[in-house]
Each structure stands twice: as C-alpha cells, then as structure tokens.
Amino acid sequence: HAGHIPDKETGSRAVPIYQTTSYVFKDTEEAAALYNMEVGGHLYSRISNPTVSALEQRIAALEGGASAIACSSGMAAMHLVVTALCSSGDHIVASSKMYGANINLLQHTMPRFGVETDFVNPNDLEAIEKAIKPNTKMIFGEVIGNPGLDIMDVPAVAEICKKNRVPLVLDATFNTPFLMQPFN
C-alpha cells in the first residue's frame, strides 16, 4: 500500500481507473497555468492522469525516491532519461554487460543525435573513472546485468559519480525495491 492514501470519501484502498482523455478547467487562467507548467494538475491523459499519478507515487515510495515517471516500457524509460540528460556533443559511460536493447540504443541510435558512449566493464572501477570526459552527462549500468547476472558495485560506482559530479543512472529491472534501493 506504499505511496497511497485511501479515498477519504469512500475509504477505498483501490485506486479507480480514470477512463478520460481530457479535463475540465475552472477558467482560462487555470488552463493557461497548467499548460505553462506553473501549477501541477492534469491536462490530457496521454500526459498524466490520476491513475498513473497513483502508480508513480507508489513506485517513488517503494524506491525511496521523491517522485517517479511511469513509462510504457523499460526502453521508453531508458530513452527518456538519456534524452533528458544528454544533448548533441555529450558523452555517456555505460556498462558493457547489459541488456542488448540498451546497448543498441547507446551504440546505434544516440550517435545519430550526436551522443557518444564508451562501454566499460562495470566491475573495473578504474576503467569507469578513466572513461569520464568533461562532456560526460551520465554513467549508466544495470544493478544486475542482463543476461549475465553481473552484479555492479553500486556504492563504489556512486562514489566515482559523486567525485566527478556525474549522475549515476541504474536499470534495476532484475531486482525489486525490497532487495535494492539505489537512492540509499
């Protein structure tokens, strides 16, 4: 039940599924404030809705994070984080022992947008640190590598990231928040 407060009116523990695509605004000022991202709220279900917000709040609570963004797939999440952190001319240091689709995204798709990646052994801390460049925007790895089940030393890599002021992005698909909370 993490991250969810039961409905005050009904006492329901379950979150209703909101089957709407659009929302009513009090006035044009409220609509303008929402569209300008000056206030929080729902504009259109493709962007957000109360059902997805409940999921995001629960995931954030389980992971120990401040907030979360729900994506339609793991690769959508990966693409979202890469494009949020990187622009043309930027660089990524990534694990060489990870899910093939992640490697394909970084090795074949992102170079078309001017983002280069160096792949390193996730257990070679010296290689990770040496691969960092002035334009490195993230270090990416999997807590438990897919398919080889390689275990990344997350605390050690996090220290390298802190020292170099580079975000550590982790794919935790193979483990649950019960076993690993990367924020901790």
Question: Where are the model-predicted features located?
Answer:
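N-terminal glycine-rich, Lys/His-bearing helix-loop that initiates the first secondary-structure elements
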Residues: 1-39
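Residues at alpha-helix termini
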Residues: 10, 62-63, 113, 164
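Alpha-helix initiation/capping motif
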Residues: 10, 44-48, 121
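Conserved N-terminal alpha-helix of the aminotransferase class I/II PLP-enzyme fold
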Residues: 27-79, 101-108
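Conserved PLP-enzyme active-site core in the AAT-like
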Residues: 68-184
